[in-house]
């Protein structure tokens, strides 16, 4: 009888050791997976914050660019309607035929192509300035963290 008790006790001890090892193995896995989950959650939260920051930055500079374009279009419409004038440093050649007097020369004016180029340049300058400002802010707020 004592031999059967010894065998049963040995089997029970082996089962307890095996179960202890299995529980410890699954516990270690659970701890590892929890750490990975926490790290992934932290990374996702950081990415979402960065996405919100970039979206806010994009919205702000897109609005500035749209405002600049609206200002240029308003200026173009005002100049076309005669409400505003472009100043140009120019001279008008005097007419050599006939008597000279006040108002003989025409007022200096840009050609249609030059006026169009002026608006394109203004628009390009505003667009590039807005893009540079956006990229500088993006680098400061996102890349240098």
From Swiss-Prot:
<dbReference type="Pfam" id="PF03245">
    <property type="entry name" value="Phage_lysis"/>
</dbReference>
<dbReference type="GO" id="GO:0020002">
    <property type="term" value="C:host cell plasma membrane"/>
</dbReference>
<comment type="similarity">
    <text>Belongs to the Lambdavirus i-spanin family.</text>
</comment>
<keyword id="KW-1133">Transmembrane helix</keyword>
<protein>
    <recommendedName>
        <fullName>Spanin, inner membrane subunit</fullName>
    </recommendedName>
</protein>
<dbReference type="GO" id="GO:0044659">
    <property type="term" value="P:viral release from host cell by cytolysis"/>
</dbReference>
<keyword id="KW-1043">Host membrane</keyword>
<feature type="topological domain" description="Cytoplasmic">
    <location>
        <begin position="1"/>
        <end position="3"/>
    </location>
</feature>
<keyword id="KW-1188">Viral release from host cell</keyword>
<keyword id="KW-1015">Disulfide bond</keyword>
<keyword id="KW-0735">Signal-anchor</keyword>
<comment type="function">
    <text>Component of the spanin complex that disrupts the host outer membrane and participates in cell lysis during virus exit. The spanin complex conducts the final step in host lysis by disrupting the outer membrane after holin and endolysin action have permeabilized the inner membrane and degraded the host peptidoglycans. Host outer membrane disruption is due to local fusion between the inner and outer membrane performed by the spanin complex.</text>
</comment>
<dbReference type="InterPro" id="IPR004929">
    <property type="entry name" value="I-spanin"/>
</dbReference>
<keyword id="KW-0812">Transmembrane</keyword>
<keyword id="KW-1032">Host cell membrane</keyword>
<keyword id="KW-0578">Host cell lysis by virus</keyword>
<feature type="transmembrane region" description="Helical; Signal-anchor for type II membrane protein">
    <location>
        <begin position="4"/>
        <end position="24"/>
    </location>
</feature>
<keyword id="KW-1030">Host cell inner membrane</keyword>
<keyword id="KW-0472">Membrane</keyword>
<dbReference type="GO" id="GO:0016020">
    <property type="term" value="C:membrane"/>
</dbReference>
<comment type="subunit">
    <text>Homodimer; disulfide-linked. Interacts (via C-terminus) with the spanin outer lipoprotein subunit (via C-terminus). Part of the spanin complex which spans the entire periplasmic space. The spanin complex is composed of one homodimer of the i-spanin linked by intermolecular disulfide bonds involving two Cys residues and one homodimer of the o-spanin covalently linked by an intermolecular disulfide bond involving one Cys.</text>
</comment>
<keyword id="KW-0204">Cytolysis</keyword>
<feature type="topological domain" description="Periplasmic">
    <location>
        <begin position="25"/>
        <end position="145"/>
    </location>
</feature>
């Amino acid at each position: 009888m004592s031999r059967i008790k010894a065998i049963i006790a040995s089997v029970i001890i082996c089962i307890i050791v095996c179960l202890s090892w299995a529980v410890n193995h699954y516990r270690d896995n659970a701890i590892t997976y929890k750490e990975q989950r926490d790290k992934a959650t932290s990374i996702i939260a950081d990415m979402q914050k960065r996405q919100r920051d970039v979206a806010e930055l994009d919205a702000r500079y897109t609005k500035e660019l749209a405002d600049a374009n609206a200002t240029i279009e308003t200026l173009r419409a005002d100049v076309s309607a005669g409400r505003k004038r472009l100043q140009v440093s120019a001279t008008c050649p005097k007419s050599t035929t006939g008597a000279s007097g006040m108002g003989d020369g025409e007022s200096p004016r840009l050609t249609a192509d030059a006026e169009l180029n002026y608006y394109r340049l203004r628009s390009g300058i505003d667009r590039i300035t807005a893009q540079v400002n956006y990229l500088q802010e993006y680098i400061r707020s996102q890349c240098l963290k």
